Each structure stands twice: as C-alpha cells, then as structure tokens.
Amino acid sequence: LYPNGNIMLEHPVSKGYYCRLNLDRPVGLDDVQRIKQRMKEIIAEDIPFLRFEQHTTEVVELFRQKDMMDKVRLLETSGNLYSYYYTLGDSVDYYYGSLLPSTGYIHLFDLVKYYDGLLLQVPNKEQPNKLEEVIKQEKMLEVFKEHRRWNQILGIGTVGDFNASCNAGHATELINVSEALQEKRIAQIADEIYHRGQKGQPVKIVLISGPSSSGKTTFSKRLSVQLMASGL
C-alpha cells in the first residue's frame, strides 16, 4: 500500500497497541480503512508464518539486502551464532517469540485512528470473542512520546542502536545523559507542584504508581529533594 512508508508498532496503550505510520503526510481515515481492508484480505488468504534458522551472518545479510538496518544492528550485536527469522509470503522479518501457524488464526481485531497514529485493538483475554474496550490514556501516550524524544536525544532508536553504542564504549555517556534528563524532568514536576501552590491550588498528596522494583521509592526521594529545593 505504501512502498515508501513504514509502520512502527510501539507501545501497549488504551488496551491496544499504538502504531506510527511514517508517511510524507498526516495519516487520514482513508489510510486506516485501506490498511484494515488489506489486513482482512491477508487473514482470509490464510498465509502461513514460516520460521527459518540460519547462521547469524547469513540472516544479517538477508536483512541488509532488504534494507532493514534496525534488524541488522540488532542481530550483529546479539552475540548469537545462529538466528532465526519469519516469512509471510514475500515479507521477511524478525520476531523474538513464537507466531501463529497462519494468518487465518486471527479472528478478531480492529484498527482505528488514534491521535497522530493508529491503535490496533485486540481481543479481551478473558472474553476472546470481544474486543478490549478502548480507554483513553492521553497522559500515558504523552509519556511514551517523551520517551521517544529522549531516545532521539540519546541517538538510540532501537535495541540494536543501544547495543552498538555500548559496544563502542558509550555506555557511561548514555547513563549520564539519561540521569540528567530524568533529573530535569523531576525538577519540572517539582516546579509544577510549587506553582500550583502559588496559584492557590496546593498539592497535598503525590501518587506514584508502577510495578514492583520499578524505582518508585527512588523517584519519591529524588522528587522530595527537588521539592525542598523549591522551598516546599
């Protein structure tokens, strides 16, 4: 559909998966319908996913010929003697896990316009005949966008980029810049809390959520320091 475009499946958000379609123009509703229709056609064709395993140098060369340089950097820095890849018709790609036997196994999905990108809706885990209900998560999406901007500052777009940078001896620099970006963001949060108080809207409690061992306690201590620096 778009020979000069590419799609990036990015983050799980709003009970689905946020995707960026990189074109030379904004993504429109017509684009969404065209892609969804093509997806339905591929499912109806019941095309098999085929898995192949070869020497990593051969797989790297295959992706290099396809100009899939993100996969080239990933596999070149993986340290594995052998690597595998999947084919779907004429398409070749890498995936770290297992895939369905064929496209015909996909029975329920939807694709909708979602802000400046797309949202791939998937079935509910407990009720697989129903799609997950879309929950608007504007703040979560903004966090992911900020994460992408930070990666651009660091020059890290993929795991392969990260591995290559570490192999080149830039690990300490990556850590230092990442820490500086985090400290700057925490200071901005502290400033916002301070200014709300100045406007007569004092913040009485700050809630921090995240999974186990995600850095909540460390974040709270760093935020406390910044709040004290703001006079709170």
Residues of each region from the PLM?
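Conserved lysine of the Walker
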Residues: 216
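Short coil/loop residues immediately preceding or within conserved phosphate-binding loops
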Residues: 203
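Hydrophobic positions on the alpha1 helix immediately C-terminal to the Walker A/P-loop
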Residues: 219, 223
